[in-house]
């Protein structure tokens, strides 16, 4: 699962119409109620209604987010976050209203979407979040409790339906952990020693982009492969943040054997494709993708355990990073690797709730030809 909360913009009109069309055809109620406003086909009016955040005639200001599945490029649901509670919302409604489109229910989206919504509540300075659901809606209750919800009581709403009131104390829930993986800039491929291979002059110039991308990001720590090209790629950014770079041998690139990189740009049954087809296979003297993945994930899990709620940068390599992405999204394969092989620089942002991946998003890349 790879999701993100987004504000509605004209670029997302197809995703909106797809989701709302399914909901309408199902003859089930739209949820949250905030997305029911007007006819969604009148997009400009619909959007203007969603963008009302100022208090109007006693109306509590709110923020509406749609849940985008980044892998499938579809809306799977939406959340409505009220900035504070009036007397009515304190009884029924709460801070967060949420809903998942009919075809995507019972897949874990609601739990993950609420987790991201809680981070938006944290940004608004809400220390304790109230969520409510109908007593007979077992799925909603489970999603709320999965996010730390504690049942306070049950009340009868204005429709005569029993409703459960849950409180979520954000002080008891660490913020999400954000990891920026930075694949190194272009390196001197003719330099055969993998550990000491430097960046090209162009690669050194490109490395300034890392600091620019992270300029407004409050980074807590920098980690890196011990290989020079990765260290040099994030050095300017670490210096700009006044932080040291902590190296971890497990974050190094795959050990290449005989003709290990043959076939990076070729078709056919090359060593590259054999490795991606069988994570246990490697060329003589080389390292399998399974071994690379195991040590990189081991290092990442330890870093996540020690840095919960923090923002981190990890300097990495093309193959090493690809095995990490494959671990969390097994569909990531050889063609995905070939798509990014020339991206030197390449920055991917992953967010985690503890050890659980919430989102994975490509942030920035520079296309530089891979040197065979």
Segment roles from a protein language model:
Residues 1-95, 160-172:
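GNAT-family acyltransferases
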Residues 68, 82, 95-106, 134:
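A short, internal acetyl-CoA/4′-phosphopantetheine-binding micro-motif in the GNAT/acyltransferase core
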Residues 97-100, 106-119, 123, 142-146, ...:
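Conserved acetyl-CoA-binding loop-helix of GNAT-fold acetyltransferases
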Residues 121-132:
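Conserved GNAT acetyl-CoA-binding A-motif
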Residues 132-133, 145-165:
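Conserved catalytic-core motifs of GNAT/GCN5-like acyltransferases
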Residues 176-247, 344:
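Active-site-proximal alpha-helix that buttresses catalytic centers in soluble enzyme cores
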Residues 197, 239-297:
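Phosphate-handling substructures
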Residues 329-358:
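Domain-level recognition of soluble alpha/beta enzyme cores
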């Amino acid at each position: 699962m790879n999701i993100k909360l987004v504000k509605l913009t004209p670029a997302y009109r197809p995703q909106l119409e797809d989701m709302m069309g399914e909901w309408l055809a199902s003859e089930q109620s739209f949820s949250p109620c905030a997305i029911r406003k007007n006819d969604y086909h009148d997009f400009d009016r619909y959007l203007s209604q969603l963008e009302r955040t100022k208090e109007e005639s006693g109306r509590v200001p709110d923020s509406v987010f749609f849940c985008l599945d980044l892998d499938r490029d579809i809306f799977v649901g939406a959340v409505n976050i009220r900035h504070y509670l009036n007397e009515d919302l304190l009884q029924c409604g709460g801070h967060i209203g949420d809903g998942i489109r009919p075809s995507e229910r019972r897949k874990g989206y609601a739990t993950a979407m609420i987790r991201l919504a809680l981070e938006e509540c944290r940004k608004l300075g809400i220390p304790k979040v109230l969520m409510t659901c109908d007593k007979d809606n077992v799925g909603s209750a489970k999603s709320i409790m999965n996010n730390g919800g504690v049942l306070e009581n049950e009340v009868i709403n204005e429709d005569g339906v029993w409703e459960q009131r849950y409180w979520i104390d954000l002080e008891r829930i660490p913020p999400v952990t954000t990891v920026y993986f930075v694949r190194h800039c272009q390196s001197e491929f003719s330099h055969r020693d993998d550990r000491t291979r430097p960046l090209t002059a162009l690669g050194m110039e490109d490395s300034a982009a890392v600091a620019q991308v992270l300029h407004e990001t409050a980074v807590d720590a920098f980690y890196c492969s011990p290989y020079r090209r990765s260290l040099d790629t994030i050095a300017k950014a670490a210096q700009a943040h006044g932080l040291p770079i902590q190296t971890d041998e497990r974050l190094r690139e795959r050990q290449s054997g005989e003709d290990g990189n043959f076939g990076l740009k070729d078709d056919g049954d090359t060593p590259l494709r054999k490795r991606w087809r069988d994570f246990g296979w490697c060329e003589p003297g080389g390292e399998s993708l399974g071994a690379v993945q195991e040590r990189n994930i081991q290092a990442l899990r330890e870093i996540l355990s020690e840095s919960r709620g923090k923002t981190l940068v990890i300097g990495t390599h093309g193959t090493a990073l690809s095995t990490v992405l494959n671990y969390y999204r097994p569909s990531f394969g050889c063609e995905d690797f070939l798509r990014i092989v020339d991206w030197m620089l390449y920055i991917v942002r992953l967010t985690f709730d503890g050890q659980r991946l919430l989102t994975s998003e490509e942030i920035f890349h520079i296309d530089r030809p891979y040197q065979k």
